[in-house]
Amino acid sequence: AIYFKGDWLNQFEKESTKDKEFFSTTDNVVEVDMMAMFGESFNYGEADGVQILEMPYVGNDLSMLVILPKQGQMDKLEEDMTIENLMKWNSKLKKEKVNLFLPKFKFEIKTMLTKTLQEMGMPTAFSGNADFSGMDGIKSLQIDQVIHQAFVAVDEKGTEAAAATAVVMIESMAPLEPEEPKLFNADHPFIFMIQ
């Protein structure tokens, strides 16, 4: 099991969280607690019709990367999610002042992996022919089920996640130029990852 709890380097003010519309589809709107932050510096970039924002955690070893497609373009983003594109999008990041709107969210997922693992070449482990004698001294054990659970909660203070994978990145600094802050308004579906 993996557990992660990280506080944002730049935390949201609770007073700035307001009820706002979130367009889960172009036809479906729900009210969410939308966090807001104005004029803060983040690694930010735009490429291939998506906005990319890196939100560092205290210590700067880990961050949340938020990838926001244009509204109604989530299917295209899912198709475009390749390691090559992620590397390209990461290379476009530079320090920018950003007006950020991000919903508070929490989700939990439970997935049964038994069938998947059997199809990947592990059928014997789930049968009476399994040999786990190294665990019990006799051949009396077999796998019944494999369940994967993941939990993520994002709020003003930071992120709490279980079963998350982390990749340590080095933050590069770019000089700041005084200009209008970029708008990153996550009021529709987006993809995030902890890296």
Describe the function of each predicted region.
Residues 1-195:
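Secretory/exported precursors with cleavable N-terminal leaders
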